[in-house]
Amino acid sequence: MVEREKKRQKLVLKGKLSDTRLHNRCWRCGRPRGYIRDFGLCRICFREMAHQGLLPGVVKASW
């Protein structure tokens, strides 16, 4: 995620940093799509970590 920080600093210097220009990315793999905001993960990493029991309070839905 070093590249993301470099890009952010570059935008700050140019005065072009705004919330709409920043794209949410998964903190684990950097994937920009399928982002789950509450966890900061993409759907794939969220699923893997939930199956491994690494996300406290997350249970598989059953109805």
UniProtKB/Swiss-Prot annotation:
Positions with a binding annotation for Zn(2+): 26, 29, 42, 45
Any one GO CC term of the record: cytoplasm
Function per UniProt: Binds 16S rRNA, required for the assembly of 30S particles and may also be responsible for determining the conformation of the 16S rRNA at the A site.
Transmembrane regions: none
Single GO MF annotation: rRNA binding
Cofactor: binding comment: Binds 1 zinc ion per subunit.
Keywords noted in UniProt: Metal-binding, Ribonucleoprotein, Ribosomal protein, RNA-binding, rRNA-binding, Zinc
PANTHER family documented for this protein: 30S RIBOSOMAL PROTEIN S14 (PTHR19836), SMALL RIBOSOMAL SUBUNIT PROTEIN US14M (PTHR19836:SF19)
Complexes and interactors: Part of the 30S ribosomal subunit. Contacts proteins S3 and S10.
Biological process, per Gene Ontology: translation
Cofactor: Zn(2+)
Family: Belongs to the universal ribosomal protein uS14 family. Zinc-binding uS14 subfamily.
Gene: rpsZ
HAMAP family: Ribosomal_uS14_2_B (MF_01364_B)
UniProt-recorded name of the protein: Small ribosomal subunit protein uS14
